[in-house]
From Swiss-Prot:
Zn(2+) binds at residues 355, 357, 539, 554. Pfam families: DabA. It comes from Roseiflexus castenholzii (strain DSM 13941 / HLO8). It comes from the Bacteria. GO terms for cellular component: plasma membrane. GO terms for molecular function: zinc ion binding. This is Probable inorganic carbon transporter subunit DabA. Its main location: membrane. It is a peripheral membrane protein. Keywords: Cell membrane, Membrane, Metal-binding, Transport, Zinc. Forms a complex with DabB. InterPro entries: DabA (IPR018752).
């Protein structure tokens, strides 16, 4: 089965005479734009959503991108060879898998061409390849002086960026923050003598010579450094990768601006800053042969290719990676081919819809084991309600939808059953509590006042320190409830009624409510056969002392929990007026059907039901039975996860799991989406009973109910893309945590509340901590590309692929696999690239 044809792969251009052509300003500007597009965005910690680290390289094949990243970032794109060797020894990778991988073609001439040769390549003790990255002036300066100028430059830019981009962590605001990034950096650099002291005597001369405009600086610097035409994009991309994390954050700022129809030039500013340093070092060491050394090394930029030996090594590793994925495919196909028969009742006692998140698969399977009277459903965790949720006392909120989308509605938090006067009083009280807490925090952590705090006040914190350590209290209040008393917290809920907040109108009109409800139900393939209780369960996590906590929340909710979405959805779906509107559109919800909002805690596998007072007494027994079933399913799910968490199966599993969620020293409170490997869009019947080990995104989809295939198109352009982002984030963080991950969690220091450094210097780190993918002994996340399996007519899928460039790039260039399922859940065809399919 071929994912794509070898001959369609894009390869870097060879060295050509064009490299000697005149480099124009337009060429430089275009190359800068392309280099900037190669950088993947990095979301801040407040909503740390998973991002495909290879996002800017989708126009290359997976194999070509591996070579390009080795050259420009010194990055690996496969696991260490010993990983595949062990899989061969253990029998996970068979000779048939190796043969199947070879049958799809070699990524490079000279790579192992037979099963025996590939196996020998894997099992040999030959050293792993060492990549020599494309040169920068900072690299050449290190060769000339023996001083690590590359690290000095990165540290300097990072220290400045941490202050400039700070989102509220620092108490001393940068005086240049209102200026553009490049203007602010120039203003500060004028007074900074550090480069001069470190030996870059030409730094301030370069600063004076170069223009005040970022793009003009880029053009002037490239011209000064005589970068060859064929090496422009490679060189500029290489520079951005030396400040990968901060470039990623700047790319996020551009992403957000463009999503809302605006523009942002911060990434261009950062590229200009990095180029100023290049010119400064080039000038500073002119007397030590820099010009000649750089002239010689800069020719390496042309062609952007590895030597033949490294190409062969990478090609061999890519073949082993492909064989490893073939081994998983065998296992997955067999699992789907023998599903457990589903018992269909006339009407289910309850239906429970969960996010497609792989962690939900274990819980759904556990719930179906507890009772066959509950039908489970999988859908993106925002449940089709793309909202911005504004907390009490705030004027802006977070986007509770995938980052590919923009919120369509603004929903404000309110106090249930309260008058407008009471709501205003609660808002004012919360705002006051927040201001007081901020002043107190400034006193505790201020550079002078902290000494006064530790002496007279510090002893009063002994009790809290002890309680925090025991997991009885949180080290810091949860931001969702901070500033509210216990009684008010129980009454806080979303309000659908129109209100004016911050110059904007919140809420949803009656027609909007019907429209969004219709879209959500159709996308879930839930338009008939409603149970008496229908649970919509968003998900979130419970951890403490975890900067990346939002990365464990719902990616489909923009890095927030799904609580707001399900509570809004349930309010609308229980509204008689909305049901009347739905009935007119052919969706009849029985009068005795009640929708219930819940939240699945993926750390503890507890499910919380919201707004119980709104559930009619007629359904009290239904609710009691549902909660009992959810509790039983939680126990089963915790028992299954216990092995990965290394919890004694004979001990108190429930207590141990909950303790981890409150332990501020715990680096692995849960495994998140580690292991994610498949995305399945089909009726639940096709996967029910199959033990998918919490590795599959499960999306309910029945193409027979999808007239015009609008839902299929939505699945392939939103949830499938988001799942691939998650999968490739875990992939990159596993195969090369140095480049695509965030390193050792125990060394993290939060900077500006937006990201982390590893230690107290260096670049802003991207991706996941090492502890999120490795347990200290082995990989918990096994790196492999996502296997997408959809039950739908091939013609419909092909038409969608043809219409959407990003979907086609992902598939044609081998960034994920796509398989077609039949009505029995068996794989019948695989997408082979170029809008072609092959029978399995």
């Amino acid at each position: 089965m071929m994912m794509h044809m070898a001959e369609t792969r894009t390869r870097p251009a060879p060295m050509m005479a064009a490299s000697l052509q005149m480099v124009t300003a337009d060429m430089i500007a275009a190359a800068a734009k392309r280099a900037e597009q190669r950088i993947a965005p990095l979301w801040p910690l407040r909503n740390f959503v998973a991002v495909n680290p290879y996002l800017g390289l989708l126009d290359y094949s997976f194999e070509t991108a591996a070579e390009l990243l080795a050259r420009r970032a010194g990055a690996r794109t496969t696991a260490p060879r010993a990983f595949y060797a062990q899989a061969i020894r253990d029998g996970r990778i068979t000779d048939a898998d190796l043969a199947s991988a070879l049958a799809e073609g070699s990524p490079s001439p000279g790579a192992p061409a037979t099963v025996e040769a590939l196996k020998a390549f894997a099992l040999s003790n030959a050293p792993e390849p060492t990549f020599t990255t494309l040169p920068t002036v900072a690299d050449v300066a290190r060769e000339i002086t023996g001083v690590n100028w590359a690290d000095i430059v990165t540290d300097s830019i990072s220290a400045w960026a941490g202050a400039y981009f700070d989102l509220g962590q620092s108490y001393w605001r940068s005086p240049w923050k209102p200026m553009s990034a490049y203007a602010a950096w120039r203003a500060e650099a004028t007074y900074d003598r550090t480069p001069h002291i470190r030996g870059a005597q030409g730094f301030h001369q370069a600063l004076r010579e170069l223009p005040e405009s970022a793009m003009e600086t880029i053009i002037a610097a490239v011209e000064m450094l005589h970068i060859p035409a064929d090496g422009l994009e490679a060189y500029l991309h290489r520079l951005l990768l030396t400040i990968h994390g901060w470039a990623g954050y700047a790319r996020y700022l551009r992403w957000e601006a463009e999503l809302y129809g605006g523009a942002d030039h911060t990434l261009t500013d950062l590229l200009a800053i990095r180029l100023v340093w290049e010119v400064a070092l080039w000038r500073s060491f002119a007397s030590r042969g820099m010009a000649e050394a750089w002239r010689t090394r800069s020719h390496e930029l042309v062609g952007d290719q590895l030597d033949a030996a490294l190409q062969r090594a990478i090609a061999g590793d890519l073949l082993l990676q492909r064989a490893f994925e073939k081994a998983y495919q065998r296992q997955l196909f067999a699992c789907l081919g023998t599903p457990k028969p589903v018992k269909h009742a006339t009407r289910k006692r309850a239906q429970a819809a969960f996010c497609i998140d792989v962690r939900s698969e274990i819980f759904r399977r556990a719930l179906e084991t507890v009772t066959d009277e509950i039908e489970t459903i999988g859908f993106a965790g925002f449940f089709g309600f793309p909202i911005e949720y504004v907390p009490l006392a705030e004027t802006r909120g977070g986007a509770q939808c995938p980052v590919l989308l923009t919120p369509q509605f603004v929903i404000a938090e309110s106090v249930g059953g309260a008058s407008e006067t009471e709501v205003t009083a609660v808002i004012e009280k919360r705002a006051l509590n927040q201001r007081v807490a901020k002043v107190w925090r400034m006193f505790k952590f201020g550079p002078v006042s902290c000494f006064g705090f530790v002496g007279p006040v510090g002893l009063a914190y002994v009790r809290k320190l002890l309680l925090d350590t025991l997991g009885i209290t949180r080290p810091v209040p949860h931001p969702a409830t901070f500033g509210l008393d216990a009684r008010t917290r129980e009454r806080v809920k979303p309000s659908l009624e129109p209100r004016a907040i911050g110059g904007r109108t919140t809420g949803m009109s009656p027609e909007q409510r019907v429209n969004v409800a219709e879209g959500a139900l159709k996308a879930m393939s839930l338009t008939s056969n409603f149970a008496r209780l229908v649970l919509l369960a968003g998900h979130g996590s419970t951890t403490v002392n975890n900067p990346h906590a939002t990365g464990l929340d719902c990616g489909a909710c923009g890095g927030h929990t799904g609580e707001a979405n399900v509570r809004v959805a349930v309010q609308i779906l229980n509204d008689p007026a909305a049901r009347t509107g739905l009935k007119a559109r052919g969706i009849v919800i029985p009068d005795d059907t009640v929708f219930v909002a819940g939240l699945h805690d993926t750390t503890t596998d507890d499910v919380t039901i919201f707004d119980k007072n709104d559930i009619p007494a007629s359904h009290a027994d239904d609710l009691r039975r549902l909660e009992a079933d959810l509790a039983a399913a939680g126990r089963l799910a915790r028992a299954e996860r216990a092995a990965l968490l290394k919890i004694d199966p004979k001990g108190n599993i429930d207590g141990a799991v909950r303790q981890r969620s409150r332990d501020w020293s715990q680096v692995r409170p849960e495994w998140g989406l580690a292991g994610c490997a498949a995305f399945i869009a089909a009726p639940r019947d096709r996967t029910a009973g199959a033990k998918l080990d919490g590795r599959s995104f499960l999306h309910n989809y029945d193409w027979r109910q999808d007239e015009g295939f609008g839902v299929l198109e939505l699945i392939m352009t939103a949830p499938m893309i988001v799942a691939s982002w998650i999968n490739l984030q875990y992939y990159g963080s596993t195969v090369d945590n140095r480049v695509f991950g965030s390193g050792n969690k125990t060394l993290h220091n939060v900077v500006g509340t937006l990201g982390v450094l590893e230690g107290n210097s260096g670049d802003l780190r991207v991706g996941l901590p090492w502890q999120s993918v490795h347990d200290g002994e082995r990989y918990v996340h096994e790196p492999m590309r996502l296997h997408v399996m959809i039950e739908a007519p091939i013609e419909a899928m092909t038409a969608i692929i043809a219409r959407h460039e990003q979907v086609r790039q992902l598939l044609d260039n081998g960034w994920l696999y796509l398989f077609a399922l039949d009505e029995r859940g068996k794989v019948t065809h695989t997408y082979a690239g170029g809008l072609r399919w092959e029978a399995c």
